Amino acid sequence: MTVPRVVLVGPMGVGKSTVGALVAERLGCAYRDTDDDIVTAEGRTIADIFVDEGEPVFRAIEKRAVHTALAEHDGVLALGGGAILDADTRALLAGHRVVYLSMEVDEAVKRTGLNAARPLLAVNPRRQWRELMEARRHLYTEVARAVVATDGRGPEEVAQAVLDALELKEA
């Protein structure tokens, strides 16, 4: 069994994909995103899965994708924003180098706006995002070895902060 060098968690729009690719590049390893794994395996977008099947079906698909990626991938891994909702997934993350990328609501609204591709924020994104974070923040913190705030920082700066937080050296 392989183990990811870094696992990134955090809300939608925080920059897990962008930062994850930069961290992987700096470490000289591969990058993987479980949202991409889901889209590839299912042959449709996450938004389509939500609309066609509902959130419970999506969460079951996501759980399988995360468990597979944690077992197979030895680089940098980004998880979907809601992956930490599953207790089994949180238990699997124990012992991994997990970094919670955080951001405040004003930054989140700037980044996610009214994007229709984000089904959980389709109506009143500011309120929805606050509610999601109230439900999830403690779960992100529970699984994380480090927390890196992304507000007002560019992806390069956040990537460096992730490396610094985990005391990892660039390749």
Curated annotation (Swiss-Prot):
InterPro entries: P-loop_NTPase, Shikimate/glucono_kinase, Shikimate_kinase/TSH1, Shikimate_kinase_CS
Gene of this entry: aroK
Binding-site residues, ATP: 13-18, 118, 153
Top-level EC class: transferase
Cofactor(s) the protein requires to work: Mg(2+)
Organism listed in the record: Streptomyces avermitilis (strain ATCC 31267 / DSM 46492 / JCM 5070 / NBRC 14893 / NCIMB 12804 / NRRL 8165 / MA-4680)
Statement: the UniProt record of this protein carries the keyword Amino-acid biosynthesis: yes
Localization (cell): Cytoplasm
Oligomeric form and interacting partners: Monomer.
GO molecular function ontology, one term from the record: shikimate kinase activity
Cellular component, GO annotation: cytosol
Functional note: Catalyzes the specific phosphorylation of the 3-hydroxyl group of shikimic acid using ATP as a cosubstrate.
Main localisation: cytoplasm
Enzyme Commission number: 2.7.1.71
Protein name: Shikimate kinase
Annotated positions binding Mg(2+): 17
